[in-house]
Amino acid sequence: MSSDIHQIKIGLTDNHPCSYLPERKERVAVALEADMHTADNYEVLLANGFRRSGNTIYKPHCDSCHSCQPIRISVPDIELSRSQKRLLAKARSLSWSMKRNMDENWFDLYSRYIVARHRNGTMYPPKKDDFAHFSRNQWLTTQFLHIYEGQRLIAVAVTDIMDHCASAFYTFFEPEHELSLGTLAVLFQLEFCQEEKKQWLYLGYQIDECPAMNYKVRFHRHQKLVNQRWQG
C-alpha cells in the first residue's frame, strides 16, 4: 500500500499549552476533508505522521518545537529485549483478549488510572462521556485489548485496526500493579498484530523529554518519522 499523499486541506489551531511539555506551546494541523476520514486513507495518514482524537485527524504543527516524532514497529522484524522477555515470563499467569466493546468494569479501572497518573491532565476528573468522545470514531474499526489477572481486569488498550497495520491509541491500567502494564499492553498488541499478519504497529509520538512517553524507543526494530522519512 502506498504511503504517499497529495496535498490535503488542513486547518491550524491556535497555540495552547502543551499536554506533554508544559513549559511549551503546541499547535496542531487538522485534516479538514471529509473523504480523508476513512480507514484506508487514515492508514496512509498514519504513515505520514497523523493521529486521531475521536473523529478528528491531526498532527503536530508547532512553531519552534519538533519533539513529537511519530514512531512505529515493524511487526515481522520485532526483536524483544531481555527485559521485555522477562516481563512476558512474569506475566505468564495473565491472559488477554481483543473485544469489540469494553468490559463492564472498565470505568472503575480508568478512574483509578487517571486519578493516580494524570490528576493534572486534561482528562481529570475522569468522565465516561469524555472518554467515549475521545476514543470512539465513526469510520474506523476500534477494538479493546483487555488484560486480566484471573477474573480481574487490570488493563485496557484501545487499538485501531486497519488492513495492514494497527495503532495503539490509548492504554489505561491498574496504577499500583507490580508489572509494567503499559509495556505489556504493547507486547500483547504486537502478538495480536502477528496473529493478524499486520506489517506495522503505530505507537503515536515519541517525546524524548517526556518520561511518560519515551518508553517507546525501548522496542527494537522501531522507526521514527524524521523530516517525512521513516528512519530506523
Curated annotation (Swiss-Prot):
Any one GO cellular component localisation term in the record: cytoplasm
SUPFAM superfamilies registered for this protein in UniProt: Acyl-CoA N-acyltransferases (Nat)
InterPro entries to which the protein is assigned, alphabetical: Acyl_CoA_acyltransferase, Asp_Glu_LeuTrfase, N-end_Aminoacyl_Trfase, N-end_Aminoacyl_Trfase_C, N-end_Aminoacyl_Trfase_N
Subcellular localization(s) per the UniProt record: Cytoplasm
Enzyme class: transferase
Superkingdom, taxonomy of origin: Bacteria
Keywords: Acyltransferase, Cytoplasm, Transferase
Gene Ontology BP annotations: ubiquitin-dependent protein catabolic process via the N-end rule pathway
EC number: 2.3.2.29
One Pfam family from the record: ATE_N
A molecular function (GO) term: leucyl-tRNA--protein transferase activity
Catalytic activity, as annotated: N-terminal L-glutamyl-[protein] + L-leucyl-tRNA(Leu) = N-terminal L-leucyl-L-glutamyl-[protein] + tRNA(Leu) + H(+); N-terminal L-aspartyl-[protein] + L-leucyl-tRNA(Leu) = N-terminal L-leucyl-L-aspartyl-[protein] + tRNA(Leu) + H(+)
Effect in UniProt of substituting Y58F: Strong decrease in activity
Phenotype when changing C18S: Loss of activity
Protein family (similarity comment): Belongs to the R-transferase family. Bpt subfamily.
Main function: Functions in the N-end rule pathway of protein degradation where it conjugates Leu from its aminoacyl-tRNA to the N-termini of proteins containing an N-terminal aspartate or glutamate.
Protein name: Aspartate/glutamate leucyltransferase
